Amino acid sequence: PKKEVALIETSKSFARKIIDLCCPEKNPQRKEFSSIEGVESFIKQLGGEYVIKFDGLMGGKGVRVSGEHLKNIDGGVAYANEIVRVGGKFLIEEKLVGEEFSLMSFVDGNVCKHMPVVQDHKRAYDGDTGPNTGGMGTYSFENHSLPFLSEKNIKEAQKTNELVAKQLFEETGTPYVGVLYGGFMLTGGGVKVIEYNARFGDPEAMNVLSILKSDFLSICISMVDGSLKNQDVSFERLATVCKYVVPVGYPDKPTKNFEVFCDQNDPSLFLASVMLKDQKLIACGSRTAAVVGKDKDVFQAELFAETGIANISGNLFHRKDIGTKKLIDSRIKRMKELLK
């Protein structure tokens, strides 16, 4: 998309404003700040259940959550102070509780064609522990849904992407052309928006593009020339599990400049933060490589992903629990309790 509408990703406050205009019920309670004034009282107003978001891009690491990264109100005030010191603006939002999912849509400025929904895992370590990352891995089901989502939930998210694309045009006069990525959360109070991105999700793109049946170039051309309505966009009925291997110490103090050994001819392998030096693959410090497993059964797809990862070596680690029965069952159980 063009810069005017890509602001949906680069400015958290602009994104919330757009959502307010077209589907305000999808926004959490929130307030914008550029100074420390009023921060403590608003956090108290939210009952100490809050999220602080830097109003800009920080590689998926500018969000701090109470009870996870921020242990108390003083921790929240201290992080707000950090942002103010570098001249930044930030949002404080109510903390939403539920299960996150990603829905990406192809958009030609008028028509949206939706991709299968995917669930990302931001935390660095097994069991959803450790610091936030750009995303350690993702999974999608063969029915293009997720086990804790209803058809109604998915339709709601699709409608939200459509309304947001339309509102962006109305607000800026610039049609949104490209991939629109909605980050959603299913809560006890329904589907809410966490954030928007003006691009493919990483790792989510590897899940959906791995099962895309239609010609990708044709889809891109149809977005640009406004003919997406007549373009076939279809996906194989397969489950996918994508897992990243990352340097030890990632994301805070990643090791760098070590050799990575892998089968570069493996079609399920996607190299990322590496460089070729003297015919050797060298890790650069961010997420190193991803492997995608595909099958009609998500747990078999997970085993395929693990098999691919077993062929990669270096000073690396990955999350073994993504796409496993234990983790997926815990997500279903948690959502059932929230929806009681």
Where are these regions (language model features)?
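Short, conserved charged micro-motifs
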Residues: 38-39, 71-75, 149, 153, ...
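Internal nucleotide-binding/catalytic subdomain
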Residues: 47, 63-203
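Active-site "cap" helix and flanking loop/linker of ATP-utilizing ligase/carboxylase catalytic domains
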Residues: 155-181, 197-266, 276-277
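Structural element of the ATP-grasp superfamily
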Residues: 19-20
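Catalytic-core regions of core metabolic enzymes
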Residues: 4-6, 39, 256
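Peripheral (often C-terminal) accessory segments that flank ATP-dependent C-N-forming ligase machineries
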Residues: 222-340
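A short, GP-enriched loop/loop-strand-helix hinge that lies immediately N-terminal to
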Residues: 1-11, 23-34
